[in-house]
Amino acid sequence: RYGEHGWDVVAGENVRTFSIEINNLVDIAQKMLYSRESFATNLQKDEEKAVLEILKIGTSAGGARPKAVIAYNEKTGEVKSGQTRAPQGFEHWLIKLDGVSDVQLGATKGYGRVEMAYYNMAIACGIDMMPSMLLEENERAHFMTKRFDREGGETKHHIQTFCALKHFDFNLVSSFSYEQLFQTMRELKLDYQAMEQLFRRMVFNVLARNCDDHTKNFAFRLKKEGKWELAPAYDICHAYRPGSDWVSQHALSINNKRKDILKEDLLIIGESIKSKKSAHIIEEISDTVGRWREFAKEVEVSQGLADAIGKTLLKI
């Protein structure tokens, strides 16, 4: 999710960039979840303050998901704080910490691998996403994705979520639709390729059971002297739990339905964007999602998690 309690960090240039250990981030995130009060760490005070600033314990539809904005060097594997301009050789990434649990979400250990499998599956479905990877340490696997509001180490692009552009109340769950999202794209004069891209994401979310498809999980990017464009997809992961207030059904409706969505419902949306390939896209994504266990095995998702998720996926 992008926005409040999302990915933004202090952009001041006088903040000292320092190397950080991922296990320190995990440790502090765990303590933050168990107690919002002060806690002891093995870091210096200024480093502890900076780590707290880059850690975002955001409450999303699935629960508390600890994230941190970091500067990462792909060649050396070195991690630094991501509050400032990225040093030479570093780029800004968002890391979602694995091995941190809270009572609302339950244990997260293993979900970094699930999100990586979903990333690979989404890419195979033709969905546009930023480069992503797993950072492994101490038997944990943290999902990392490059930030789409940054380019190189310095350039920052303007981003607005669907929610922000339309001045929606994010807390009004089950009040908005994919049709409204497509209409917003028309208002921004986005082209057919963008419409088809969103159609792919919608179909994927239905078949792969990503019910965390709320108004802050779709965004638009405006580059300097450019035009509005659909931002790359993010927060693409399995999010379905029967009985949940948040993810027992889709946040955005499709043809006035949030569950029990049929192929016909998807085709109606396809007709509305004048797509001649909607039936083919649905079949293509259905076949790819049907290979879930291949994607899960590739990144070593545990057998139990892979089976539990596989039982919920749809084929239409």
Regions found by a protein language model. Give the residues of each.
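Phosphate/dinucleotide-binding and metal-coordinating scaffold of catalytic cores
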Residues: 1-215, 219-316
